[in-house]
Amino acid sequence: MDFLVLFLFYLAFLLICVVLICIFTKSQRLKAVVLGGAQVCSRVIPQCLQRAVQTLLHQLFHTRHPTFIVLHLLLQGLVYAEYTCEVFGYCRELEFSLPYLLLPYVLLSVNLVFFTLTCAANPGTITKANESFLLQVYKFDDVMFPKNSRCPTCDLRKPARSKHCRLCDRCVHRFDHHCVWVNNCIGAWNTRYFLIYLLTLTASAATIATVTAAFLLRLVTVSDLYQETYLDDVGHFQAVDTVFLIQHLFLAFPRIVFLLGFVIVLSMLLAGYLCFALYLAATNQTTNEWYKGDWAWCQRWPLVAWSPSAEPRIHQNIHSHGFRSNLREIFLPATPSYKKKEK
């Protein structure tokens, strides 16, 4: 099986896995399948190896550390290094427009600014000083966010839409999720930075993919490769087709073709997640609320007896006040003002 088929199978497998995870992330069946597979594997994998893998996974996904920030910057650096060293130079030889070639660098500069802000900004940490203020920002729905509930770890009253982050060990106002790529929680006060960071990251990947694809197409057009022929395995001359052309380009420019495949997949994944994040912003939901929304009524505390004849209390989004108001709330979040006490 040639390289192109294997590469396409790899891309298809990766995309299918991501789509299935997104679709069935709220399904109990998926959890049962994963747990069943883990139990089967535990019978054949040595205990020492299992403990090592569990320790590694715990360190990666259940503790706060900068590993994914380093990985993020490393991958971004490798992509831009390849773009600068090869794609940019070849495109200049083919007389591409300079502003067009510099656009990825502009997007990178903006992206790094908002990446830093997302990493460093306070997501909305709840403290004794701002507890009373944050309790008044959002209404309690008494389903997902009951009144008078306290965080047993922080010993603070929990404002509506807040959540305690296990990795950061703090309660976060309007908690969305903990992002390992920025090593920080995404909350009320840094969601705006996160959205712009995600938007510029998607745009930079898509721009590099577009420039790289345009270079390869220009190269094929200039060299008239479509008019050439090649000798097949049985000794017959064949006209150049798309499959042969891609394989030829990979042999001639392996790093550029691999870069193109990587940024195309990355652009698709980022674009999908960006659309999801924008949907949540437009409807004034958080990832935490979206994930728990379908069964939040049965997770209330304290637990109460439920009569079969009574209708279950389903979570409803009471915080959406229209598209403009929802976006204004994200980009101009409510923050407490601290005044010095006069003597």
Swiss-Prot record:
InterPro entries: Palmitoyltrfase_DHHC, PFA4/ZDH16/20/ERF2-like. It is a multi-pass membrane protein. The keyword Acyltransferase applies. It catalyses: L-cysteinyl-[protein] + hexadecanoyl-CoA = S-hexadecanoyl-L-cysteinyl-[protein] + CoA. Keywords: Acyltransferase, Cell membrane, Endoplasmic reticulum, Golgi apparatus, Lipoprotein, Membrane, Palmitate, Transferase, Transmembrane, Transmembrane helix. Belongs to the DHHC palmitoyltransferase family. Interacts with CPT1A. This is Palmitoyltransferase ZDHHC4. It comes from Mus musculus (Mouse).
